[in-house]
Structures are given as C-alpha cells and as structure tokens.
Amino acid sequence: MANGVHVTTSKTAAPTRLLTQAAGERQTGALVVGGHPGGAVYVLEGRVIYAESPAAPGVGELLTSSGRLAARTWQNALDLGTSTARVGRLLVEQGHLTQGELELCVLGATYDAAYFALSAAAAPVEFRTGAAHWLGPVVHIDPGAINREVRRRIRLLDEIFPDPRVDTAAVSPVPRPPRERITLTALQWELLVHADGQRTPADLALLLGKAGYATVQELRRLAALGLLELPEVRTDSTEFVRLPRTRGSAVDAHRPVVRADGGPAVPVVSGAAPVAAAVAAPDATDPPDPALAEETGANGAVYRPPRLARRKPGAKLPKDLAGEAPPPAHPGTDEVLLKRIRTALRALR
Amino acid sequence: MAIPGAVGASIVDYTTGFPVATTGAAPNEDHEAAAAGTADVVQAATSRSLFVSAVPHDLLEDLIITTSGGYHLLRLVQTDFDSRLVLYVWLDRVQGNLAMARRRMQKLADELVAT
C-alpha cells in the first residue's frame, strides 16, 4: 500500500506526460509526484481512480470536517477496509453514505488533488507499479480529461490574478481594506477570518474542509481585490497604514474578478430544435397539474413572446387554454436522460 | 420521470466550469463552453449580484435563463460536504414546460445525492 508521498528513486519530468504514458500502457499503480505540494495519482488499468495531495483535503477530511460523517465512523471504515482497499464501498454498504454522495465526493477530491499533483511543469516523479489506494475504485476517470482539466485550471487562476505565490504563502489579510466598501463571498469571509498570518492556503482548505483549488481560487480573487498581503510586500514592521504603493501593486481595479465576456452567449435555437436526445416521453399519460397547465398551453401553441401570467395562483384556467393541454407528446428527454446523467457520470471517468 | 422538451443536460462544477458529466446536446454543440458559461452565471448570482443574501440564511436554488428559443435551467446540487455542483438542463422553448422541468430537476438533484 503505497499511500505515502515519499519519493525514493525518481526522475524529473512533466507529471502529466507520465500520466498519459501510464494510461497508454494501461498500467496499474501510483504516479507519485514530489516537490511542493506534490501528490499521488492512482491508476487502475490506465484509468484514474483517485488522487491525493497535501494541498487538497481528501475524501475523509471533506466528509468529516463538514460533519457529514463522524470522525469515529470514518476511522472505523479505515480500520476495517484499508487492508483490503475497500473503504469507500464499506461506507456505502454500512449505510453511512449513499453511492451518489460517495461518487460526487471522490470525483471532486480527485480532480482537486490532481491539480496540485500534476500542475508542475517538471517535478520528481516515480511510477509505483501495483500500488493500490485504500479507498478502492469508486470512479474511473479518463487521464486525458484530468490532464486537460489541470491545464485549464492553471489558466483560470492566472486570469484571476497572475501571481502563483498566493497559492502557497501563508495567508495574511491586509489590516485595512483598500477601499471604503468591500463585498465578500461566504468562503472568502471564512478564509479571512481563519487566516492568522501563519496558515497556508493548504492549511485553510484542510481546516475548513473546502476544496484546495476553490480555496486558492478565492485567495487569488482576494489578492486581486487588494485584500491580501502579497509575500513580497510583507514586512516585519507593524505599521497599520499601508503606503499607496502597496495598494497600487495589489489592487487591479480594472480586472474583472470573473471573466465577464468571452463566455459563450446563450444560443438561439433555430426552428428545428435538436432532437439528439429524442426519446419517447409519455407526456400524455402524465397530465400536468393545473398550476403547470397555463405554461403548457402557451407552449403547446405557436410561440408568443411576452406572455405574462394573467391568472392568479389557484384560479381556474380559461377553458380554451385548458383544452389544449397537454401538448402533443414530444419525443423529448425523460427518465432515460436523467438516468444517463448518472450513467454518464460513470462513463466519463 | 420525464422532462418534456429537454434537449441536453450536464452536471457542472461551478467553481471551475468543468462539465463533470454531459448528455444530449449542448448549445453550439459545445458542452465545455456551456459549462464555463454555467459557472459564470452561478458565480454572478452568488458572489456579485447579492440576490442570495437578501434574506438571512437564504440559499440559491435555481436559475432560469429564458431565450426566444429555449429555457436554460440551472439547479444547485446540495451536498453536506463541499462539492459545488450545478445541474444544467436545456429545454426547448416550444416543447418544454418550465414549471414541470423545474420541479423534476429538483427531484433529480436530490436523487443524485440521496441514492
């Protein structure tokens, strides 16, 4: 069980390249990445089943620090399932977690840790053939998808605030905000409240049970807002009023925190609506309840643009409208589509 | 369970705009772009506009974008642990039933976690 992140004999290479290679050869084992923060990516016959990194809370930390599982429950599962690599399955079998929760949690934790393990352009890497993870296989992710996502996440951070020092240095809020009024998200507040000048982003992520990447992302946003001391400008002096120079370098007021444009516009569907996911929907057997019927009536007919509700809630429908509903059974998507989301969850990893 | 008029759907990590799972069609045949847009919209509603903090302990449930050709529904998936997922369903404007789709998406989002 090679769970440690200790590297014995290794060469320096691009971790993503080695992952691609291991996937191509359909290998089973652990890709152990050294350096800071480093981490390990576990593959089973070429598919990624889990990843861990000191900078990202693992499944256990996420589940216990959120209060979803009692620490004792988690420890019991570890004691029972570690030697046979089936901790994940045990938690579901014993009724502590649903399969859906476990999958979503493992999926999130894996992409999160993979970012930290694989984002270095070059690091000491080693492939330990045959190494398994005690969690056991819960998800199976295409390594190509992981590599692409790691690259995308690196880019996203740089779009927010291109200073990677924010990701690792001890978090230190500025003593005085650079403007009169600031707006914070809940996670940003949590981070600032718990930042004591000693804790690193990884410490905060573990402490709060938040994804490591989401933590770093919010910290970069805070840095962009000028609310964090950047490592370079930190001094040992206890001055409370910062010089304007500091503000200038830390605040980029013109930078939008989230990409405001460039994102895809909501598309206009042309006359022939896509029917790629056409599956028989037995809509006729499923009469809409009165509250829905007005909507249905309007939609069943030719589209009339600005049609606002003229009916009070609970009021009877006009006869002519009620008669139209339900619309002709549309070979729309349905249960099958929804099931396929679940199936797709499995198929995509 | 049926969502009449649904054209495509995906589950998106809204911190990163990553489509965790996709099915059916996507606007412009591009699930990744749709996911990135989904993330932007959720971020805008949660962190920039302050709709979600109008009432103490308020919680974002869903977002609905209406275009002349369709409805785009975003439903937050609530988990006890930190997950940040949103369910996105694209509905055809003529065939879709917004109220019904909204209720069924709620059920789907709950079932995703509860089963």
Which residues does each PLM region occupy?
Chain B
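Generic secondary-structure signature for well-ordered alpha-helical cores
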Residues: G5, S47-L50, D110, A114
